[in-house]
Regions:
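Cyclic-nucleotide recognition modules
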Residues: 79-137, 141, 145
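Cyclic nucleotide-binding regulatory domains
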Residues: 43-106
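Alpha-helix/helix-capping structural signal
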Residues: 25, 60, 85, 116-117, ...
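Phosphate-/nucleic-acid-contacting segments
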Residues: 164-261
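Cyclic nucleotide-binding regulatory module and flanking cytosolic helices
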Residues: 1-40, 86, 91-93
Length: 261
C-alpha cells in the first residue's frame, strides 16, 4: 500500500513494512494524517515522562532505540525499531507518559501522525486495531527477549546480536556505529567492546572506519551471536508474517553494502 502514502513511504527502498502491510481500506484511513518527517542521529523523539502525542513510522534504513536512564547517568538500550514497526503510543495508546527515552539511532526518514488520529482510525476498523495489537505484542516480546538476553548471554554474543539486528532492520552491511555507542547501548565498558571488535576484525568478520562497522561475513557474525534475534524473528513471523525485514522483498531495499564504500 506504499503508493497511498506520502513520499517517504512510496520511494523505492524507503518503505515502512507495517504501513505496507495494511489493507487498502485501512491505509486510506491513515494516509490523510501521515506526514513526512526527517531526523538526524541522536535526536530524541521522546524523553522519559513526555506526553506521547505522535506516532513515528521509521522508513528505509532509519532506526530508533528505546533507552532506559541509569543512576550513573548512562543509558541502556532495551530494544530497537526500524522499518518493521512504529514507536509512540503503540502499547499505551498514547494515554500514558513515555517511560523510556526514544532516540534516533540511525537518522533518516519517518512518516508521522497524531496518536489521536491513529486511535480514531482503529476505532473505525477492527482489522486495523487488530494489526496494531499484534504489532504491540511483537514489540513487547522483543523487549522481553532483550531482558533475558542481557541476563543470560555474554558481551560478545550480545554485541553480535545487536549488529545483526541493525543489519536486518536497515538492509545495510555498513552500520553507522562507533564502538563507544555500542558499549553504551549494551551497558558495558568500551574496553570490552574494543577487544570484541578487534577479534572480529582479525577473523575477517568486519572492519571499522570513520565511525562505521562494515560487515564482511554475516554468517560468521551470526555464529558469534546468541539465538535471541532469531527468536524475535520467529515471533514476528508467527504473529505478523512478512513484517520483519527479510534480505529482500518488494517494499524494502536488499541487504547490501552502502554506496560509496
Amino acid at each position: 500500500m506504499g503508493g497511498m502514502f506520502p513520499s517517504a513511504a512510496s520511494a523505492p527502498g524507503a518503505a515502512n513494512n507495517l504501513l505496507n502491510f495494511l489493507r487498502a481500506e485501512d491505509a486510506a484511513l491513515l494516509a490523510p494524517h501521515l506526514k513526512p518527517f526527517s531526523s538526524k542521529p541522536n535526536a530524541v523523539l521522546y524523553h522519559h515522562g513526555d506526553h506521547v502525542g505522535t506516532v513515528y513510522f521509521p522508513c528505509g534504513a532509519t532506526l530508533v532505540s528505546f533507552l532506559i536512564s541509569m543512576e550513573d547517568g548512562g543509558t541502556v538500550e532495551t530494544t530497537m525499531v526500524g522499518r518493521e514497526g512504529a514507536v509512540g503510543g503503540i502499547v499505551s495508546q498514547g494515554k500514558l507518559p513515555a517511560f523510556s527515552q526514544i532516540m534516533v539511532q540511525f537518522g533518516g526518514e519517518f512518516l508521522a501522525m497524531p496518536v489521536e488520529a491513529l486511535d480514531a482510525a482503529k476505532a473505525k476498523s477492527r482489522s486495523l486495531d487488530n494489526l496494531f495489537s499484534r504489532y504491540a505484542d511483537c514489540l513487547m516480546a522483543q523487549m522481553f527477549q532483550s531482558t533475558a538476553c542481557n541476563a543470560a548471554h555474554g558481551i560478545e554474543q550480545r554485541a553480535a546480536k545487536w549488529i545483526i539486528a541493525a543489519v536486518d532492520r536497515t538492509g545495510e552491511l555498513e552500520v553507522p556505529l562507533t564502538q563507544e555507542r555500542l558499549a553504551s547501548m549494551l551497558g558495558v565498558g568500551r574496553s570490552y567492546i574494543s577487544r570484541i571488535i578487534q577479534r572480529m576484525k582479525r577473523d575477517g568478520i568486519l572492519s571499522v572506519r570513520r565511525g562505521k562497522l562494515k560487515i564482511h561475513d554475516p554468517k560468521q557474525l551470526a555464529a558469534r551471536s546468541c539465538g535471541c534475534n532469531d527468536a524475535v524473528k520467529a515471533h514476528f513471523e508467527l504473529i505478523l508474517q512478512g513484517i520483519y525485514p527479510a534480505d529482500t522483498d518488494g517494499c524494502q531495499t536488499p541487504l547490501r553494502a552502502s554506496s560509496g564504500t
